[in-house]
Amino acid sequence: MAFVPPQAGYDRAITVFSPDGRLFQVNYAREAVKRGATAVGVKWKEGVVLAVEKRITSKLIEPSSYEKIFQIDDHIAAAPSGIIADARVLVDRARLEAQVYRLTYGEPVPLTVLVKKICDLKQAHTQYGGVRPFGAALLMAGVNDKPELYETDPSGAYFEWRAVAIGSGRNTAMAIFEDHYSDDLDMEGAIKLAILALAKTLEEPSPESIEVAYITMKDKRWKKMDKEEVAKYLGEILEEIKEEEVEEKEEDYSELDSNY
């Protein structure tokens, strides 16, 4: 008889807790997010910006067909990490809920309402048989009375942030936010910070590998930046990074000289 590891039953069953109180399938769904493309969001007083890594694996892929920031409604967008097919199902559901709310109440859906509905769906997929957890996290951002930015977890939990990252580069990006985020950021500063955090997670950052969109309280409509705009910001950021590296090397050499 083949040996069956003690945790095997908990691995297979979505609705059964392990003795130490974990749902293994939810943990595995989170692992899918940790291996996914990095997505970041930054909020400032008058708006929100999202920036996402585009992993184009072949030069034959049409870049325009590889969408990574999804518009839910005029005033709400989402950026996923993890299994994109799972994220697409969540995005389609969010779009449907936004349309139903608008038709029912005659006004745009509040982001908090939409986030809760999507997370209720995610949570249900951790509780019932015949389904599995969604292997995707979403950053959901938008404006109603104020700018808002949420992270949704595969478990169905959600959190509001000033600046946040998901995906494989989360730790690096969050460290950048901890060092550089300020409540006094303007639009220019927020966009630069988002692109900086994302660029730091990439081996070879380029305008083709970064997608950026933002919304302001004034317009209340999402706008995607074109490749030329991204290239402008990225060029400035990479130049600043080079200058910082040169200054650090100069400081290192100064310390060496002082030891002689």
Curated annotation (Swiss-Prot):
Location(s), subcellular: Cytoplasm
PROSITE patterns: PROTEASOME_ALPHA_1 (PS00388), PROTEASOME_ALPHA_2 (PS51475)
Superkingdom per UniProt: Archaea
GO MF annotation list: threonine-type endopeptidase activity
SUPFAM superfamilies in alphabetical order: N-terminal nucleophile aminohydrolases (Ntn hydrolases)
UniProt cross-references to Pfam families, sorted A to Z: Proteasome, Proteasome_A_N
Record-linked HAMAP family: Proteasome_A_A
GO CC term, one of those recorded: cytoplasm
Keyword DNA-binding: no
Record comment: activity regulation: The formation of the proteasomal ATPase PAN-20S proteasome complex, via the docking of the C-termini of PAN into the intersubunit pockets in the alpha-rings, triggers opening of the gate for substrate entry. Interconversion between the open-gate and close-gate conformations leads to a dynamic regulation of the 20S proteasome proteolysis activity.
InterPro entries referenced in this protein's UniProt entry, alphabetically: Ntn_hydrolases_N, Proteasome_alpha, Proteasome_alpha-type, Proteasome_asu_arc, Proteasome_asu_N, Proteasome_sua/b
Subunit and partners: The 20S proteasome core is composed of 14 alpha and 14 beta subunits that assemble into four stacked heptameric rings, resulting in a barrel-shaped structure. The two inner rings, each composed of seven catalytic beta subunits, are sandwiched by two outer rings, each composed of seven alpha subunits. The catalytic chamber with the active sites is on the inside of the barrel. Has a gated structure, the ends of the cylinder being occluded by the N-termini of the alpha-subunits. Is capped at one or both ends by the proteasome regulatory ATPase, PAN.
Gene: psmA
Name of this protein: Proteasome subunit alpha
Record flagged with keyword Lyase: no
Family: Belongs to the peptidase T1A family.
GO BP terms in the entry: proteasomal protein catabolic process; ubiquitin-dependent protein catabolic process
Keyword annotations from UniProtKB, A to Z: Cytoplasm, Proteasome
Main location: cytoplasm
SMART domains (UniProt xref): Proteasome_A_N
Function: Component of the proteasome core, a large protease complex with broad specificity involved in protein degradation.
